Amino acid sequence: PALTLVAFFYNPDLDIVRSQWAAARGSLVAAGGRPNPGVTGGPGYNATTPVADITPWILSLNLDFTITTAGKRSNQIAAARHQSESARLAVASAAWSVRQQVRQQSLDLYAATRAIVLLERQQRAHELNVSLLARRLAAGEISPFELAQARLLDGANRASLNDARRQEAEARVSLAAALGLTVHALDGISLAFDAFERPAPALPDADVRRQALLNRADVLAALERYEASQSVLRLEIARQYPDIHLGPGYQMDQDNLKWSLDLGGILPVFNRNRGAIAEAEARRAEAAASFTSVQSKAIEQVDGAIAAYTAATATLASSDALVADRERMQRSAAAQFAAGEISRVELAAIELTLAGAETERLNARIRAQQALGRLEDAMQSPAVFADWVFTDPSRTPPTKKR
């Protein structure tokens, strides 16, 4: 969680969607604005008035107030509000993507770090095994082939160790980039990976599907875009009906003070806004198809993630059982070695078998965590239901008081 908060603050990708959301909020304010009144006025001159008797000048002032009809303003506000909500959900979607990047890069760093620990342990075991076999070869107890095989395994382990160290360095760079920092910003910082070593949570399939459909930002954003297109269609239909123009006027004609009140509007004779309505209907159909597509892809992604997670957790359970069995064998072999029943070479071979099982368990754990990340990405929610932080609070039922 701490790394995620750092990424939310420093990652530049979020600044882009935040700016887009701010622009959408500005559009919402603009949509709610009322039209300003118009004003005209000026002097006039009556050429038939005798100048000696009375002034021939006429002063007039006319106002023009627009009264919107047929709910145009409310539909315009509704469309802008749905577009603003879609932009807000885009921020949530981008934030989730950043969170997943941080999690994936943290998992890669954990995998490389743990692999280094296991490979260094195996390296010590391989070196001991090569040393013991060299002594037995010198004593004529084994053939050179056995020592050559041990040295090949030792060399392969060294190569794997060097590769793991390279992966660790690359993972630190990738993690720093996901956080929006330089790699040197992570120098001297101890990162905890306890979350990756916890038992995999059991996630009911029905709850996962429900959470995905109710919580995924892309699904909700597609729904908001459809609602916005619906409001735009209503707005275009309402524009068939003209607005009313109310025009009070005042005129000072010599000694006569006159006022007037005009009513005006556009006659919808030649243009009934059919073209704009047809375009809005097509865009609404497009938004509906887009929502259906996004929802179908979400369901497909959830089903695939559930299957992958189920298989990965089963493999991890088998790896745990295998490591437990190898640990029992190692303890038994250590007791036999202490009693002088087996040689140090035989004990080293069993220890290498245990190290290999631990490596397989690490790989299984990484695959399980990757599958869990894929499942979380399908839901766009953390796997622990109690820790869902992207859920809309308004959708959460209130707690009943007793």
Can you name each region flagged by the protein language model?
Residues 312-344:
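C-terminal hydrophobic structural anchor segments
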Residues 164, 217, 364:
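Metallo-beta-lactamase
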Residues 183, 360-402:
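Acidic, low-complexity, intrinsically disordered peripheral segments
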Residues 37-47, 242-252:
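Transmembrane beta-strand segments that form the barrel wall of outer-membrane beta-barrel proteins
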Residues 2, 56-58, 104, 149, ...:
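Transmembrane beta-barrel architecture of outer-membrane proteins
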Residues 73, 82, 89-211, 305-308, ...:
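Periplasmic alpha-helical coiled-coil/stalk elements that build and connect Gram-negative outer-membrane
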Residues 1-32, 36, 141, 190-227, ...:
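Bacterial Sec-pathway N-terminal export signals of envelope proteins
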Residues 5-16, 22-37, 48-53, 61-79, ...:
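A glycine-/polar-enriched beta->alpha junction
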